[in-house]
Each structure stands twice: as structure tokens, then as C-alpha cells.
């Protein structure tokens, strides 16, 4: 390999790594939101500043659709040191905007039960604003990977296939400094 092609090769790799490891200034930012858990505790986008967020936005009917991705991300998270786990925030959100006022108490109880089962606080989007502002699809399983700076690094809807799961895991590892994408 001659000297020029070597430097060209290095330049291409560095450019590729930079493009995928750091969101561009043009990356879409996650819209501000305010969501509430079944126990009444609230969470805003500002509360997640400096964290890598794994956001699952789903309905009661679609919450099991991407269990394979959830399992893989759980395995990855379980391998992390406690300090690293603090950086990676799992954010399950249920679209509660269709809840009738008569049944809000039951919805809140359900969020509490789901939180206990999941090991994470499950939040409700009670007015649908988070869904609409972040371009999540109604009545669908949505996943967003949000970088520490609040930019949406990856957004997808529907059933996430195995190949896409691998890509998401690589992006998460890259954002955490665990893997270089190339």
C-alpha cells in the first residue's frame, strides 16, 4: 500500500467514525415532553440531559412487539458497570391519550404493575403530545435512541428485525464508547 492510499484509507475511516459516533448539528432533537408515571411522578426531557436514552413508545397492544430488542438491550445493560448504567436510561412510555376519564385510575395502576414487572418506571403520555411532537406512530411500537445531547440518533417504528437490532446495539455501544462503527 503506498503512502497516499494509506492516508486516504485512514481519512475515510476517521470520517466514517466521526459521522456515526457524533450526531451532526442538523440531527433532529427530541422534542420537550412531560410524562407521568402511575404513581404521579413526572419526567421531562431536561431530566434526561447527559444520558443516552432508549425510548420505547408503545401502546398496551404493541408493548410485546419488540421484546427481542428489549431482551438484547437488557443483556447489554446487565454487562455494564454501575457508573455506565447510570448513563444509559431505559424509557418505556405507554400512549395513554385514549384513556377515558372514568378509567384513568385503572391505567395508573396498570403502569405501576408494568413498572414492577419491567424493573423500570413505565411512564404514560396522557395527552399524546410526546407522540405527536416526536413523530411516533399512533397504535404502533416505536423506538428512539436519543444521544446525551438530546439529538435523536435512531428512530424506527413497527417490528424491529434481527439485523436492525444488531445495528441498534452497535449504535448504543458506539455512543457509550464501547465500539467504533466502521
Give each language-model segment a name.
Residues 1-11:
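Bacterial N-terminal signal peptides that target proteins for export
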Residues 9-19:
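Bacterial N-terminal signal peptides
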Residues 91-93, 105-139:
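Short, internal strand/loop/helix patches
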Residues 34-52:
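A short beta-strand-turn-helix
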Residues 63-113:
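Structural microenvironment flanking redox-active thiols in thiol-disulfide oxidoreductases
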Residues 46-69:
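Short active-site neighborhood of thiol/selenol oxidoreductases, capturing the structured segment around
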Residues 139-182:
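Thiol-/selenol-based redox modules, centered on thioredoxin-like
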Residues 21-28:
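Boundary at the C-terminal end of the N-terminal hydrophobic targeting segment
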Amino acid at each position: 500500500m503506498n503512502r497516499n492510499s494509506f492516508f486516504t484509507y485512514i481519512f475515510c475511516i476517521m470520517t466514517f467514525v466521526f459521522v456515526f459516533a457524533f450526531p451532526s448539528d442538523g440531527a433532529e432533537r427530541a422534542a420537550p415532553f412531560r410524562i407521568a408515571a402511575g404513581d404521579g411522578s413526572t419526567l421531562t426531557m431536561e431530566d434526561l440531559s447527559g444520558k443516552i436514552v432508549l425510548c420505547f413508545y408503545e401502546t398496551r397492544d404493541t408493548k410485546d412487539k419488540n421484546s427481542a430488542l428489549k431482551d438484547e438491550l437488557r443483556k447489554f445493560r446487565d454487562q455494564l458497570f454501575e457508573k455506565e448504567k447510570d448513563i444509559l436510561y431505559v424509557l418505556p412510555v405507554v400512549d395513554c391519550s385514549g384513556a377515558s376519564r372514568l378509567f384513568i385510575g385503572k391505567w395508573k395502576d396498570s403502569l405501576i404493575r408494568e413498572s414492577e414487572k419491567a424493573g423500570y418506571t413505565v411512564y404514560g403520555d396522557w395527552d399524546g403530545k410526546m407522540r405527536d411532537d416526536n413523530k411516533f406512530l399512533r397504535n404502533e411500537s416505536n423506538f428512539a435512541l436519543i444521544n446525551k445531547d438530546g439529538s435523536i440518533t435512531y428512530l424506527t417504528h413497527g417490528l424491529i428485525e434481527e439485523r436492525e437490532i444488531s445495528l441498534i446495539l452497535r449504535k448504543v455501544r458506539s455512543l457509550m464508547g464501547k465500539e467504533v462503527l466502521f
